[in-house]
Amino acid sequence: MLDLGLSKMALIGVVALVVLGPERLPRVARTAGALFGRAQRYINDVKAEVSREIELDALRTMKSDFEQAARNVENTIHDNLREHERDLNAAWNSAVSSGDPAAADASGGLGATSDEPSWRTVAAAPAKRRNWRVKKTATPVWYKRATMRRTQVQSGAARVARHQPSSLRRPARFF
């Protein structure tokens, strides 16, 4: 910025005193100080905004890197699962086709749906629940109260009137 020392500031003050006079100098000095302070605040705001944008950009790149790493891990896990499933299906099919009586009974007992039985079809349990009431009775009452919609909505004035003692109530006047 500007290199203003004490001697230069004193020289500027003397010139301003001579040019402006002692009556207007304090008002001009206050105005100049206010403008200088406003300029400093503006510069500090711009610096803060730039640093926030830089941090935000760094966070965005970090987020994208993290998401990419998560996708890579997910793809690796899915690939490994598919490979193991293929191995299990191959072992199951070889055991069924070789005439192993235990495997043949197991696949015939549950009724495999496809021509090529898989280890999943044998291990799969029936998905439908026999008693649909089990789900409703398993939900706690406090959860039902907290999540259900209110069916009896009461205004604030009605709520105050309901809980106000009868000794404090005003008598109702009808015309």
Swiss-Prot record:
Any one cellular-component term (Gene Ontology): TAT protein transport complex
Compartments reported by the entry: Cell inner membrane
Record's bilayer topology term: Single-pass membrane protein
Keyword Membrane applies: yes
UniProtKB keywords: Cell inner membrane, Cell membrane, Membrane, Protein transport, Translocation, Transmembrane, Transmembrane helix, Transport
Biological processes, Gene Ontology terms: protein transport by the Tat complex
Biased composition (Low complexity): 99-115
Tree of life domain: Bacteria
TM segment ranges: 1-21
Entries under InterPro entries matching the protein: TatA/B/E (IPR003369), TatB (IPR018448)
One MF annotation (Gene Ontology) recorded for this entry: protein transmembrane transporter activity
Annotated spans, Disordered: 99-118
The keyword Cell membrane is annotated on this UniProt entry: yes
SS bond partners: none
Function: Part of the twin-arginine translocation (Tat) system that transports large folded proteins containing a characteristic twin-arginine motif in their signal peptide across membranes. Together with TatC, TatB is part of a receptor directly interacting with Tat signal peptides. TatB may form an oligomeric binding site that transiently accommodates folded Tat precursor proteins before their translocation.
Subunit structure: The Tat system comprises two distinct complexes: a TatABC complex, containing multiple copies of TatA, TatB and TatC subunits, and a separate TatA complex, containing only TatA subunits. Substrates initially bind to the TatABC complex, which probably triggers association of the separate TatA complex to form the active translocon.
UniProt family annotation: Belongs to the TatB family.
Protein name: Sec-independent protein translocase protein TatB
Organism: Burkholderia thailandensis (strain ATCC 700388 / DSM 13276 / CCUG 48851 / CIP 106301 / E264)
Species lineage: Bacteria, Pseudomonadati, Pseudomonadota, Betaproteobacteria, Burkholderiales
Gene that encodes it: tatB
